[in-house]
C-alpha cells in the first residue's frame, strides 16, 4: 500500500500532480489498489476546486442565454457573452438598428436585430412615430427608382396619375364601361361636374378648358375631343355616350353626347339601325336616350352645366323639367335603386344647375339685357327643385364693377362666355383703320372681358361650389363609381321612363 502512494492523501498537496498520476493509471477502475472508497474521497475535492477545470463543459452562463431575444437564439454565429461589459452593449445595438433598419442597403448583420426590435414592439412597446403607407398606381415605379425619404426610410408619396385624355363611361350603345375604375381612389374629397346641351354648343371644348387645357393650346390635344371642321360642315356630332375624365385635384368631369341631336336621329334613320323592342320610332328613342343621360347626371353629379349658344330655347327648359320628373329616387342605405320616381321630396337629392351662355355677343353683356335674362330664367325654373340660384354670381367676379349687389334681384346661376377666338387676331381686326398710327395700334373695343379670363373665373366659381352628399351614405371615389353604375342600370330599367315612352308613342 505504501508503494502505490495512495495510503496517505496528505502527501499529495496539489491536485495537478494528482491528475498527472491518475493519467498514468490506465487500468480499469476495479484494479485500483486504493479501492472504491478512496476514489470517492477525491471527487468532492475536485468539485470544490472548480477553478482548475476547463471552461468548456461548464454551463454557468445559462441564465444569460435565456435572457437573449428570441430572434437571436437560433443564430449559430453569436457566442455567449462572458464578461459583463459586452452584455450591456446589446440593448444599445437594438435601439440603433431599429432606427436604421428600414434604410436600403442595410447589411444582414444589422438588419437581424431590427426583427427582434419589431417583435418587442408587437409585444407591447408602441413605436415612437406611426408610418402610413398609401398604395397607388405610381408607388411601384417610385420605389424602383429609389424615391426614398432619407429621414424615415420610407417611399415618398407620389401624386395621382394624370390622365392624358378622356375615356368612356357609357359607350355609344348605352352600355356601362368599367375602364374608369383604375383611376379612382378611396377618398371622399371629390367633385363631380356634368354637362348637357344641344348639338354644336361647345360642350366638349368648355369641359376641356375647365379640366386640363388652356384656350391657347391646340384643340386637337384637348382631353375631350371637339368637333373637327369636317364634322361641323356635315352637321355631325363628335361625342357619343358619356366621357369620363378626372383631374389630379380629384374633380370628375362627365361630357355627354348632345341632347335631342338631329345627327344621331339621322344616323338611326339612314343606317337602318335596329331599335330596341320597347321603342317603335327613332325620334322617340333619341329623346329617351337624352332623358336617360340627363336624369343620370341629375343623380350622380354635384354640378350640372347647361350650355346654350343663344338665348333662349323654351323647349330646353321643358326638357329639363321632364328629366327632373323622371329622375330616379335617391336610394336609401337599406335597398337598391329601382329607377322609379321618388315620392319623398325632402330626402331627394338635386344638383346645382349652371346656365352657361356660350358664344355670347357684346349686347348680352349689357347690364339691362343681363337683368332681363335672369328674370326670364327665374320664371321658367320657378317650380323646379333643382338648385338653380344662389351658388354662382357674375357680380362677384368683378365683371361689372359699377353694378350693386342688389341690381339683379332675381339672380340665377348664369354665366356668360364670349366667342372663343385668337386675341391677337381680334385686336388686329377690330383696331381702328385710320391714317394715324396711334389708333392702328390700339385694340378694338370688346365690351366684355377676354375669353381666357372669363373661363378662369368660371372655373373658380364651379370648383368653389358646395359638395352636397349624393346619397344617404358618404361615398368615396370608388363607391361613387359603383353607385353611378347602379343608378345607370336603374335608369335604363326605369318604369317611369318606360311609361313616358309609351305615352309619347
From Swiss-Prot:
Biased composition (Basic and acidic residues): 37-51
GO BP: nuclear-transcribed mRNA catabolic process, nonsense-mediated decay
Ranges where the record places region Disordered: 1-127
Top-rank taxon, per record: Eukaryota
Record keywords, A-Z: Nonsense-mediated mRNA decay
Subunit: Component of the SMG1C complex composed of smg1, smg8 and smg9.
Family the entry assigns: Belongs to the SMG9 family.
Function text: Involved in nonsense-mediated decay (NMD) of mRNAs containing premature stop codons. Is recruited by release factors to stalled ribosomes together with smg1 and smg8 (forming the SMG1C protein kinase complex) and, in the SMG1C complex, is required for the efficient association between smg1 and smg8.
Annotated PANTHER family: NONSENSE-MEDIATED MRNA DECAY FACTOR SMG9
Annotated protein name in UniProt: Nonsense-mediated mRNA decay factor SMG9
Gene symbol of the encoding locus: smg9
Amino acid at each position: 500500500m505504501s508503494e502505490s502512494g495512495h495510503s496517505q492523501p496528505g502527501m499529495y498537496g496539489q491536485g495537478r500532480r494528482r491528475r498527472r498520476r491518475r493519467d498514468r493509471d490506465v487500468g480499469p477502475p476495479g484494479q485500483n489498489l486504493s479501492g472504491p472508497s478512496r476514489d470517492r474521497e477525491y471527487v468532492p475535492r475536485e468539485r470544490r476546486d472548480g477553478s482548475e477545470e476547463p471552461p468548456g463543459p461548464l454551463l454557468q452562463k445559462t441564465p444569460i442565454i435565456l435572457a437573449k431575444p428570441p430572434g437571436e437564439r437560433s443564430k449559430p454565429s453569436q457566442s455567449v457573452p462572458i464578461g459583463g461589459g459586452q452584455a450591456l452593449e446589446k440593448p444599445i445595438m437594438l435601439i440603433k438598428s431599429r432606427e436604421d433598419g428600414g434604410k436600403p442597403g442595410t447589411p444582414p448583420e444589422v438588419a437581424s436585430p431590427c426583427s427582434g426590435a419589431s417583435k418587442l414592439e408587437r409585444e407591447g412597446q408602441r413605436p415612437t412615430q406611426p408610418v402610413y403607407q398609401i398604395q397607388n398606381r405610381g408607388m411601384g415605379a417610385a420605389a424602383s427608382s429609389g424615391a426614398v425619404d432619407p429621414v424615415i426610410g420610407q417611399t415618398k408619396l407620389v401624386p395621382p396619375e394624370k390622365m392624358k385624355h378622356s375615356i368612356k363611361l357609357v359607350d355609344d350603345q348605352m352600355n356601362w364601361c368599367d375602364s374608369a375604375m383604375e383611376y379612382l381612389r378611396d377618398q371622399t374629397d371629390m367633385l363631380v361636374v356634368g354637362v348637357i346641351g344641344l348639338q354644336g354648343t361647345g360642350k366638349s371644348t368648355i369641359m376641356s378648358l375647365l379640366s386640363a387645357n388652356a384656350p391657347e393650346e391646340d384643340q386637337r390635344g384637348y382631353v375631350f375631343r371637339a368637333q373637327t371642321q369636317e364634322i361641323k360642315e356635315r352637321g355631325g356630332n363628335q361625342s357619343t355616350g358619356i366621357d369620363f375624365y378626372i383631374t389630379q385635384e380629384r374633380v370628375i368631369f362627365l361630357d355627354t353626347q348632345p341632347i335631342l341631336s338631329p345627327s344621331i336621329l339621322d344616323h338611326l334613320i339612314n343606317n337602318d339601325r335596329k331599335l330596341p323592342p320597347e321603342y317603335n320610332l327613332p325620334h322617340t328613342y333619341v329623346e329617351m336616350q337624352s332623358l336617360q343621360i340627363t336624369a343620370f347626371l341629375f343623380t350622380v353629379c354635384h354640378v350640372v352645366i347647361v350650355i346654350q349658344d343663344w338665348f333662349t330655347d323654351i323647349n330646353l327648359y321643358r326638357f329639363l323639367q321632364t328629366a327632373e320628373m323622371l329622375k330616379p329616387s335617391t336610394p336609401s342605405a337599406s335597398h337598391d335603386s329601382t329607377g322609379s320616381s321618388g315620392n319623398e321630396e325632402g330626402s331627394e337629392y338635386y344638383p346645382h344647375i349652371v346656365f352657361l351662355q356660350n358664344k355670347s355677343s357684346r349686347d348680352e353683356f349689357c347690364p339691362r339685357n343681363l337683368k332681363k335674362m335672369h328674370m326670364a330664367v327665374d320664371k321658367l325654373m320657378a317650380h323646379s327643385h333643382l338648385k338653380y340660384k344662389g351658388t354662382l354670381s357674375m357680380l362677384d367676379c368683378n365683371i361689372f364693377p359699377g353694378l350693386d349687389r342688389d341690381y339683379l334681384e332675381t339672380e340665377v346661376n348664369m354665366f356668360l362666355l364670349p366667342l372663343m377666338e385668337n386675341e391677337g387676331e381680334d385686336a388686329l381686326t377690330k383696331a381702328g383703320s385710320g391714317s394715324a398710327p396711334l389708333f392702328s395700334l390700339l385694340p378694338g373695343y370688346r365690351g366684355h372681358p377676354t375669353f381666357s379670363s372669363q373661363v378662369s373665373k368660371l372655373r373658380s366659381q364651379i370648383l368653389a361650389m358646395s359638395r352636397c352628399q349624393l346619397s344617404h351614405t358618404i361615398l368615396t371615389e370608388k363607391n361613387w363609381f359603383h353607385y353611378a353604375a347602379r343608378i345607370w342600370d336603374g335608369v335604363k330599367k326605369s318604369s317611369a321612363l318606360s311609361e313616358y315612352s309609351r305615352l309619347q308613342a
